[in-house]
Amino acid sequence: MARFVALVLLGLLSLSGLDAIQRPPKIQVYSRHPPEDGKPNYLNCYVYGFHPPQIEIDLLKNGEKIKSEQSDLSFSKDWSFYLLSHAEFTPNSKDQYSCRVKHVTLEQPRIVKWDRDL
C-alpha cells in the first residue's frame, strides 16, 4: 500500500512539473479550398505544439482584426495544446490576410501571412 501511495505521489509531482515546460506555438495559415478571387472561402489558422495553454489568436485582414471563431482547446499525447481559429472570407488580389498569435513564450506577437499559392 505504501508503495502505491508513493507511486501516486510521484505521478502527481511529475504532472505538476508540466507547468514549468514552455513550448512556443507553431502556426499554419491556409484556406479551406483553393482560393479564387471573389469566391467565398474559409481562412484557417492552426496553432499547435504550445504550452502553457493560455494563448490569443487573431485573424487579420490588411492588419485589422476580423471576426473569427475558434475551436475548443485540445491537447496532444505530449501534453502540448492546439487550436484552430477560422473565418469566412472572400479572397482578392488586393487584400492581405494573416494570423497573429500572442503567447508567453513569444517576446512579441508572431504574425504569419496567408500565402495563397500554398
Curated annotation (Swiss-Prot):
Component of the class I major histocompatibility complex (MHC). Involved in the presentation of peptide antigens to the immune system. Residues 1-20 form the signal peptide. One of its GO terms (molecular function) is peptide antigen binding. Belongs to the beta-2-microglobulin family. The keyword Disulfide bond applies. Keywords: Disulfide bond, Immunity, Immunoglobulin domain, MHC I, Secreted, Signal. CDD domains: IgC1_beta2m. It is found in: Secreted. It comes from the Eukaryota. InterPro entries: B2Microglobulin, Ig-like_dom, Ig-like_dom_sf, Ig-like_fold, Ig/MHC_CS, Ig_C1-set, MHC/Immunoglobulin. Disulfide bonds join 45-99. The gene is B2M. One of its GO terms (cellular component) is late endosome membrane. This is Beta-2-microglobulin. Pfam families: C1-set. One of its GO terms (biological process) is immune response. Heterodimer of an alpha chain and a beta chain. Beta-2-microglobulin is the beta-chain of major histocompatibility complex class I molecules. Forms a heterotrimer with MR1 and a metabolite antigen. Residues 25-112 form the Ig-like C1-type domain. It comes from Bos taurus (Bovine).
